[in-house]
Amino acid sequence: MPTTSYTLSTTTELSFEEAVERVRAELQAEGFGVLCEIDVQATLHEKLGVEEEPYLILGACNPSLAHRALSAEPELGTLLPCNVVVYRRDETTHISAIDAERMLSIVGRDDLAPIAAEVRTRLAAVVERATKTS
């Protein structure tokens, strides 16, 4: 799975709409709910009048993992929810999720590492399975 230094990413030949549908289903399968969504394309068009390709940010949260993390460190709320993005560039659909291990490494708390690892594993599964064909 291609990644940046802070994301778990892949590309797919799926349409934008199909990729969003699959990401939502895989998030649910991994115990995540979508707390918010930001249609970046629509927002930039409305606020700036620019035309962009589809770009959607899904703010995902696994309640059990969030509860464990916030119980250990209440300030972690500033890093939540975990963002998953689906966007189109150059006729290709991209799916990316935040790498929770990288994100939580800035906190400097070793006791949070198991939670971060579990979130990373679950989000990596979402990104990977969203592009699988049956």
Give each language-model segment a name.
Residues 24-25, 36-38, 132:
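N- and C-terminal low-complexity/disordered segments
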Residues 21-22, 39, 118, 122:
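Short Gly/charged-rich anion-binding patches and loops
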